[in-house]
Amino acid sequence: MFQGASSLSLDAKGRLSVPTRHRDVLSATAGGQLTITKHPHGCLMVFPRPEWEKFRERIAALPMSAQWWKRVFLGNAMDVEMDGTGRILVSPELRAATGIVRDTLLLGMGNHFELWDKATYEAKEAEATQGEMPDVFQDFAF
């Protein structure tokens, strides 16, 4: 459903303009309603509300041994809605938790997006691509 990378800037109020190519899909499939939460790799996950509900149910069903991860995902989730110009507000708490100040990278990851501080993503990608590829790619043809 969602793919590709977009370099975006937050405005002074912490709002992000969703790229035009994604707005129509988000309006049609989620009524412009999204949920943003933390990702364990230091970015944010941005879900269309129906996809969030599926993810939330899976997380909520985890055993007590995963209680802290439930807190990370569910306790930090914030519901947002695209405004008339396609902007969403990224809360100060979520921005602070991920180091997002202004320059960001929005990555389409299939059924959701990842929102990264641009410099953080570039550093992590450079580090990952300098190392060996995971074994799961051993039989993968490029």
Swiss-Prot record:
Its main location: cytoplasm. One of its GO terms (cellular component) is cytoplasm. One of its GO terms (molecular function) is transcription cis-regulatory region binding. SUPFAM superfamilies: AbrB/MazE/MraZ-like (SSF89447). It is found in: Cytoplasm, Nucleoid. The keyword Oxidoreductase does not apply. PROSITE patterns: SPOVT_ABRB (PS51740). This is Transcriptional regulator MraZ. It comes from Variovorax paradoxus (strain S110).
